[in-house]
Amino acid sequence: VGDWFQTIVDVEASPEEAGALAEGVRSWLVSSGVVSAERTHCILGAELGHPSGPRAGEVVDASGWSGPWQGGLEINVGRTVFDGGQGDPTAVSCPHCSATVELMDDDFQLDRQAWEPFRDVVHGWDEGRDVVIPCPSCGRPVEPAGWRWDDDYFVFGHLGFRFWNWPPLRTGFVAGLTARLAGHRVVFLDGKL
């Protein structure tokens, strides 16, 4: 048992435009009946979220889910490190040369030495700092949001939509939400706490 989530992150939204984009998507979700306008205590880790609306069942594949499901939508606006929940990151790749840094040792434990510089990147972003480190392979500097984490374990952005305890979102719904984000590139991640 646990809490499952699916997150759609706009990785290109600037801090200046994230609020307006969030409001546009929120308005669409409310007017479509996917979520309710009223915010309640329906999400994990945040004070209030939007509970599922009367038409939420149309945007999910609930075929593998038994009994009633409920959950909420958390909209994150502002500098955020979105993550995959349980476990640790396994590897990260350079966007310039595609070299991969393995972050797990042979016993599937986090390799502290390999992780150390990336820990600073992740925590720095959360604290409002851009920790730029060189790729250990090609030496080129990499911005925090430039690193490519295996299974999108970490995603850096200023706008994200996290659906807590919903059945899998339908592809068409994700595409519809994405279309309202000014053509920006998005990353979809899911996880469990």
Give, region by region, the residue ranges found by the protein language model:
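N-terminal alpha-helical interaction blocks
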Residues: 1-92
